[in-house]
Amino acid sequence: NIFGKKSHVMRDGESVEQITLTEDFIYEDGEKQQRIWKIQKDVSEDGVELYRGQAADVIGIAEGSAKGSAFFWKYDVDLKISESKLRVRFSDWIYQMDDYVAVNKATVSKFGIDIGEVTLFFVRGTPASIIGPFDISEW
C-alpha cells in the first residue's frame, strides 16, 4: 500500500476504506505547500480498485483506479501563476516499487494539451528516516 493512514467509514450501510495521504511540497524558491487528501476506496466486481479523493486545493473530485502495483488518477487544480490562477488537469501514474518507495509521474495539461510533467518519489518508513529530513537549501 503506497498510501498513508487508513480508516473505515460507513457509506449507505456499507464499509468503505478511507485513506488520508499528506503531501508536503518544498519548491526551489523555498515556498512550502501541503496537500491533505481524503481518499475513499471501493472495489469493482472485476477486482479493480476504484478511488475518489478530495483535497482543499483540488477542484471537485479526483478519480482513479489501481491494478497490481500501478495506480492512475486525474484531478483539476488552480495553479497560482504570479497574480492569477490557471486551471489545469493533473494525470498521475503512481508505481509502487516496494513497501517503502513509490514513483509518481504527473502530466499537467490544459485543454487536453500537455504543458508540463513532474516526477515525484514517495519514501516512507525506515528509508525515509535515513534520508530525511530533506533540505533543498543544501542543493
Annotate each predicted stretch with a short phrase:
Residues 1-81:
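Central antiparallel beta-sheet cores of small beta-barrel/beta-sandwich binding domains
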Residues 89-93, 97-139:
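Glycine-rich, aromatic-bearing surface loops/beta-hairpins
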Residues 81-86, 91:
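Charged, gly/pro-rich active-site loop segments
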Residues 29-31, 83-85, 112-116:
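Solvent-exposed loop/turn segments connecting transmembrane beta-strands
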Residues 14-18, 85-87, 115:
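Short coil/turn motifs at beta-sheet boundaries
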